[in-house]
Amino acid sequence: AGEALHRPAELRRPSYKNRQGVFAEYVAVPQRHVYKIPDGLSMEEAALAEPAATAMYAVSKAKIPAGAEVLVIGDGPIGQLAAQLANIAGASKVIMAGSWDEKLAIAKECGIHETINYHKEDVVQRAKELTEAGPEIVIETSGSNAALNMAVQALKPTGRIVAVSWYNGANVDVAMNTVIVKDAELVGSLASPNSFGPVLRYMASGKLKVKPLITHVKPLNELEDVVKMIRGKKEMRIKVLLKP
């Protein structure tokens, strides 16, 4: 999200992926990579278009059947947005597993049917209790190696797991025999191709609720303190925005 300050007639650049821009007051990008913020959507809300687009691409790869039961693991921005988008995609029940009661309460406010705090409950057992023999779709957003195996164990036979995170180490141990016995699919999801336009429309229509996910708005000159807060993992946060 941002304001266009200068628009050359044509900006020939192959890509933005190798260019600096993080925490900058200004950044130059090719015009074809820019989307108009819909009327009525604030700059703060529009800033969540990027994680929302990542979540939407993961949900599209999940190929959620109408009426399916879905488990989303992870209560951060991607998990929160993926859970809402699973609802929009036609799931009959969406369950979120996470580690903060406050974040799970926000998910409930945004329409998520059931939540599981994995510090207090067994995710696999509780997910099976809340569904018919397990969720048909699991979207894993936490990046926890253990959570990926939770997804495998909780999944209903013939179901699909979508992993949309980055895991510790070059390799992750997965119970592949269980994947095979369940005749399941394990799918990776990277970035957000062709997803910005749709999520901006969902956000503008109010179907995708992003304002409750913005837990902090800080000035750019407090960046160092914000990074310390995030690394400390002691304060509840979902999305932290910096304003120049």
Model-derived features with residue positions:
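Adenosine-nucleotide cofactor-binding segment
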Residues: 72-73, 80, 87-150
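Rossmann-fold dehydrogenase core element
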Residues: 159-162, 173-213
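Conserved acidic E/D residue at the C-terminus of a beta-strand in Rossmann-like folds
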Residues: 98-99, 165, 190
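Helix-to-beta-strand junctions that scaffold the AdoMet/dcAdoMet cofactor pocket
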Residues: 155-157
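A glycine-rich, Thr/Ser-enriched phosphate-binding loop motif common to dinucleotide/cofactor-binding enzymes
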Residues: 17-23, 39-61, 73-81
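Glycine-rich phosphate/adenylate-binding loop and adjacent beta-alpha elements
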Residues: 1-34
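C-terminal hydrophobic helical "lid"/dimerization subdomain
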Residues: 145, 149-153, 193, 197-244
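Short helix-loop-beta connector
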Residues: 41-42, 63-69, 133-134
